[in-house]
A protein has these predicted regions:
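Bergerat-fold GHKL/Histidine-kinase-like ATPase
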Residues: 1-115
Length: 115
């Protein structure tokens, strides 16, 4: 299984993130720890969501797409009044409620506990 990068798949009804076996084993352990959950989400979900938003942008508004994730993401953007956002990275951060800020806060708390 070795060292392979994570790879998202956007072809199905849901977005799937594939990890190597060792990365997935680490993920299963780490996701249970509150202090690590924020940075973990930022590391895995944010880049994949940015890529999904690029796909959504290229394929217009997504409402005619038959993939459930495309329709759900387009509806959520519209519902939050973010449909006109032009930068996928900024939009992804808004959709995930500032994950970098939360990840930094979690990491700071872990560092303070460790000190």
């Amino acid at each position: 299984d070795g060292d392979i990068p994570m790879e998202p798949s956007f072809d199905g009804e849901k977005i799937v993130i594939f990890l190597s076996k060792s990365d997935f084993a680490d993920y299963k352990i780490l996701k249970l720890h509150e202090g690590v959950r924020g940075p973990l989400t930022t590391t895995l979900v944010l880049p994949v969501l940015v890529e999904a938003l690029h796909i959504l942008k290229e394929e217009s508004d997504g409402m005619d797409d038959n993939r459930r994730w495309v329709r759900a993401l387009a509806r959520r953007i519209e519902r939050l009044g973010l449909a006109t956002e032009s930068q996928p990275l900024l939009l992804a951060q808004k959709l995930l409620e500032l994950p970098v800020k939360r990840a930094l806060s979690s990491a700071r708390m872990l560092a303070e506990v460790s000190s």
